[in-house]
Amino acid sequence: MEFVKCLGHPEEFYNLLRFRMGGRRNFIPKMDRNSLSNSLKTCYKYLDQTSRSFAAVIQALDGDIRHAVCVFYLILRAMDTVEDDMAISVEKKIPLLRNFHTFLYEPEWRFTESKEKHRVVLEDFPTISLEFRNLAEKYQTVIADICHRMGCGMAEFLNKDVTSKQDWDKYCHYVAGLVGIGLSRLFSASEFEDPIVGEDTECANSMGLFLQKTNIIRDYLEDQQEGRQFWPQEVWGKYVKKLEDFVKPENVDVAVKCLNELITNALQHIPDVITYLSRLRNQSVFNFCAIPQVMAIATLAACYNNHQVFKGVVKIRKGQAVTLMMDATNMPAVKAIIYQYIEEIYHRVPNSDPSASKAKQLISNIRTQSLPNCQLISRSHYSPIYLSFIMLLAALSWQYLSTLSQVTEDYVQREH
């Protein structure tokens, strides 16, 4: 199937082949775990089990920031598991989430009542909290603070609907913006990045909001099926009486209008994303931050004006994801990628769409203010004949290529 999808994109096919034949290791070097303590090895095992995508880029981080981010991720995953578990009553969830930061300092605390897929991070929380306490104090302080603030925010929205666009921003801040702020403070604390990276909480928050809004927009149907609602009523209420009404065939037109309005809302974070990424100096940190962002803008471009969002999960092509991962290693390339996808959106904006003028104006502002002198260019450096030859050669060994690592597919799936 991936071969068929790549027929119209030979450069993606070539990059898939390069990635499978060793290009992945040039970008994401394999981490040597032999020297790690048993508890830290276990943490990385849980990281592999709960998120292959983040496991890859976390393990590519330099120095001690790698372990700090690994532990931070597992703690957040544990909190997210509590929040998402529909088998746990709200009455039990609220104190768990509000007090979760205190469990970091309780060596024996664990939670064994979860039925969620990733419950192991709760059942063996003593291993994770041990490695938390083994971190440098400068990292512990950041992680505990973010954990406390996020737990209170999650608890707040257990009994509260996402009604207004302000509520949407607030919820996304609690579950993703705080992650961006926490990571930024870790990067600065490690001295891999300048203090401004950790101090500018507005840009760090936008990094998280852009990713979270993309996930919420794309995962409309999945969330509906699971009984979750994250689209703001202030927007969808203009088109239907109930959010689930968008799946009805007779509502396809208004569903797409609502979708486009939400995507337009998400695009407003792009200037902050560009500012944030332009400040990064460490290559491993840049890769860690840039890749999810370019995946997000590509996903929004795929979702824009696309009624398939209401029929299933819209994914970018695996070859497209690989190409983005391999390209997004420097700021000029990232700007070119962003420019490409906002142009795709711009040219698909229906004139009759209620948010059309706002979308076009927003994209025009991004062009002139955040992407000056940037132009739409092909990122392929290979001749059509050469690419065709590579495709023919690769087709003969496609069975081998079919074992391609799942790391790229996970990048375009929702992170809980």
Swiss-Prot record:
Changing residue 288 to L: Retains partial activity of the first reaction. Completely eliminates the activity of the second reaction. It comes from the Eukaryota. Pathway: Terpene metabolism; lanosterol biosynthesis; lanosterol from farnesyl diphosphate: step 1/3. Keywords: Cholesterol biosynthesis, Cholesterol metabolism, Disease variant, Endoplasmic reticulum, Isoprene biosynthesis, Lipid biosynthesis, Lipid metabolism, Magnesium, Membrane, Metal-binding, Multifunctional enzyme, NAD, NADP, Steroid biosynthesis, Steroid metabolism, Sterol biosynthesis, Sterol metabolism, Transferase, Transmembrane, Transmembrane helix. The chain crosses the membrane at residues 284-304, 384-404. PROSITE patterns: SQUALEN_PHYTOEN_SYN_1, SQUALEN_PHYTOEN_SYN_2. It is an enzyme of class 2 (transferase). Disulfide bonds: none annotated. Mg(2+) binds at residues 80, 83-84. GO terms for cellular component: endoplasmic reticulum membrane. It is found in: Endoplasmic reticulum membrane. NADP(+) binds at residues 52, 77, 218, 315, 317. GO terms for biological process: cholesterol biosynthetic process; farnesyl diphosphate metabolic process; isoprenoid biosynthetic process. Changing residue 283 to E/N: Retains partial activity of the first reaction. Retains partial activity of the second reaction. PANTHER family: FARNESYL-DIPHOSPHATE FARNESYLTRANSFERASE, SQUALENE SYNTHASE. Belongs to the phytoene/squalene synthase family. Catalyzes the condensation of 2 farnesyl pyrophosphate (FPP) moieties to form squalene. Proceeds in two distinct steps. In the first half-reaction, two molecules of FPP react to form the stable presqualene diphosphate intermediate (PSQPP), with concomitant release of a proton and a molecule of inorganic diphosphate. In the second half-reaction, PSQPP undergoes heterolysis, isomerization, and reduction with NADPH or NADH to form squalene. It is the first committed enzyme of the sterol biosynthesis pathway. It is linked to Defects in Lss and Fdft1 are the cause of Shumiya cataract rat (SCR). This strain develop mature cataracts at around 11 weeks of age, exhibiting opacity from the perinuclear zone to the cortical intermediate layer. Cholesterol levels in cataractous lenses decreased to about 57% of normal. Cholesterol insufficiency may cause the deficient proliferation of lens epithelial cells in Shumiya cataract rats, resulting in the loss of homeostatic epithelial cell control of the underlying fiber cells and ultimately cataractogenesis. This is Squalene synthase. It comes from Rattus norvegicus. The lineage of its organism: Eukaryota, Metazoa, Chordata, Craniata, Vertebrata. The gene is Fdft1.
